Amino acid sequence: MGLERDEILSQDLHFNEVFISLWQNRLTRYEIARVISARALQLAMGAPALIDINNLSSTDVISIAEEEFRRGVLPITIRRRLPNGKIILLSLRKS
């Protein structure tokens, strides 16, 4: 019985390592929504746009924030806490 439990724990640890390696450089839909909404709020409060908005078809703050996110010009870093206590920092700015 104890051996089966150890095998299950070993499989769970392996799954967690694979999951972390797959998602380490990708954002979840919730992180993307949070970043875009935070940037849209900044724009609505008067922050300057980081892209040229004259070429955009729509100039509402959410469209501008989405385009800034797509182009990778946002100077935002996401701190992701993992269940094992490890912290991963993800920069949204593309080099």
Curated annotation (Swiss-Prot):
What one GO molecular function would you report for this record?
A: DNA binding
Protein location: Cytoplasm
Catalytic reaction list: RNA(n) + a ribonucleoside 5'-triphosphate = RNA(n+1) + diphosphate
Q: What is its EC number?
A: 2.7.7.6
The record's Gene Ontology biological-process terms are: transcription by RNA polymerase I; transcription by RNA polymerase II; tRNA transcription by RNA polymerase III
What keyword terms does UniProt attach to this protein? Cytoplasm, DNA-directed RNA polymerase, Nucleotidyltransferase, Transcription, Transferase
**Main localization of the protein described in the UniProt heading:** cytoplasm
Could you name the Gene Ontology cellular component terms for this entry? Answer: cytoplasm; DNA-directed RNA polymerase complex
User: Gene3D superfamilies annotated for this entry?
Assistant: 3.90.940.10
Pfam hit, one: RNA_pol_Rpb6
Its biological function? DNA-dependent RNA polymerase (RNAP) catalyzes the transcription of DNA into RNA using the four ribonucleoside triphosphates as substrates.
User: What family name appears in the similarity comment?
Assistant: Belongs to the archaeal Rpo6/eukaryotic RPB6 RNA polymerase subunit family.
Subunit structure, as described in the record: Part of the 13-subunit RNA polymerase complex.
Q: What is this protein called?
A: DNA-directed RNA polymerase subunit Rpo6
